UniProtKB/Swiss-Prot annotation:
GO molecular function term, any single one: rRNA binding
GO-annotated biological processes: translation
Protein's name according to its UniProt entry: Large ribosomal subunit protein uL5
Oligomer status and interactors: Part of the 50S ribosomal subunit; contacts the 5S rRNA and probably tRNA. Forms a bridge to the 30S subunit in the 70S ribosome.
Amino acid sequence: MSETDSTDFHEMREPRIEKVVVHMGVGQGGVELQNAETILEAITGQQTVRTKAKSPEPEFGLRQGDPIGAKVTLRDDTAVDFLERALPAADLDRRQFDNTGNVSFGIEEHTDFPSQEYDPNIGIYGMDVTVNLTRPGYRVAKRDQGTRQIPSNHRLNSEDAVSFLVSNFDVEVNE
């Protein structure tokens, strides 16, 4: 192995996708929530989980525990496949990346996906996508026994996340 190879690349420094969470907040149960769940299952290919109101909001007629949305968590190859379809429909901006290497973006219409067509009986739904990036070795901060902090030089930052998405998914990030 040459000297330049050892300084440019190390397998423990390579970012990877831990998970992708796709969320649709409808604000109420009933037919709208069922439509959102159907759309999410069709786009992601996985079963949805309902999200519930954490606190009562009388102004909106919500009680604690009322179903108000649906979400799907994708990992491994399904997360990569979903991002390959979702990122062309999104306009990424530098401020959508946080300091720990995560990115969140919205897709305004579910019809932006190639597999989805407009159905007047359902309408148009938008969704929020959150991508969580990690590096190998992050488990030491999450394990039950012997937890340690991740060293600052090993933590992901927004520049690492931007370069990962640009190089692996060929997206353009606006300044």
